[in-house]
């Protein structure tokens, strides 16, 4: 249910955003995303399955990037995620988005 809410929010952000999906994923490097993923998988487990913490494995790259940008700008509220996203630049977000989108989802 929570994953659906996140996806719905991200779709609205993508539709309302002046930045295209291409811009959200500009500079993406899957290898760099894998390198950066260590902090993410501390909470979002490698298997992508955890009670209470949404799975990010297999999440559409555009959705992932939109959600991370929403946390970064404060449009979505969650203290930990705002802190994490706030430390990432656009290339890092894009690289993480592409990396996690290529992992098998938990659904």
Which residues are covered by each model-predicted region?
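Positively charged n-region of N-terminal signal peptides that target proteins for export
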Residues: 2-4
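Bacterial N-terminal signal peptides
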Residues: 7-16
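Residue-level hotspots at or immediately adjacent to binding/recognition sites across diverse folds
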Residues: 21-22, 46, 84, 99-101
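Gly/Gly-Pro-rich "capping" loops immediately C-terminal to redox-active cysteine motifs
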Residues: 30, 34, 48-77, 82-86
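Electrostatic cytochrome c docking/interface patches
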Residues: 17-37, 104-105
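Residue-level marker of structural boundaries
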Residues: 42, 61, 73, 102-105
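The canonical Cys-X-X-Cys-His
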Residues: 33, 38-46, 96
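C-terminal capping alpha-helices of c-type cytochrome domains
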Residues: 71, 86-107
């Amino acid at each position: 249910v929570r994953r659906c809410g996140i996806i719905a929010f991200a779709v609205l952000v993508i539709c309302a955003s002046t930045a295209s999906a291409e811009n959200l994923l500009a500079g993406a490097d899957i290898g760099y995303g894998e390198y950066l993923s260590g902090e993410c998988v501390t909470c979002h487990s490698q298997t992508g399955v955890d009670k209470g913490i949404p799975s990010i494995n297999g999440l559409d790259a555009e959705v992932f990037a939109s959600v991370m940008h929403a946390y970064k700008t404060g449009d979505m509220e969650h203290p930990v995620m705002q802190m994490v996203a706030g430390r990432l630049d656009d290339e890092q977000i894009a690289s993480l988005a592409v990396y996690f989108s290529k992992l098998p989802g938990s659904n």
